[in-house]
Amino acid sequence: MNIRHVLRTLALVAIVAAGLQFARAAGQPGTVKGYVIDSSCAFTKGLSKPISSECAVACAKAGSQLVILTSAGTIYWPISDATPAVGQNSRLVEFAGKMVVVKGKVYQRSGSRAIVISSVDAAK
């Protein structure tokens, strides 16, 4: 095997890896069902659902970011794909403490999950 062949193979592997990384970063359409809960309680209290809607609203109004907590315990961070990015609490606060179905573009990176919201509806 000559050095030119090795370099071509390495270049091809790098191009494929970059393409896969880009595809993963692009996000996929998805649906998430879970409770709208403030991020502090989701992490520090180990809750499986919000204490109350009033508590979640109060925390959101105090600046805590609202997240979606699934029944499996997965936390989805609502994010914006706008530049500059904008917070998503205003889209979720009316559902704080309640079960919702969120549709949008789902992203995953190093164990973290996020969703760019296209629609939010109360779960039935």
Region spans (language model):
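Residue-level detector of alpha-helix boundary/anchor positions
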Residues: 12-15, 29
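OB-fold and OB-like single-stranded nucleic-acid-recognition modules
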Residues: 21-124
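Bacterial N-terminal signal peptides that target proteins for export
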Residues: 1-11, 18
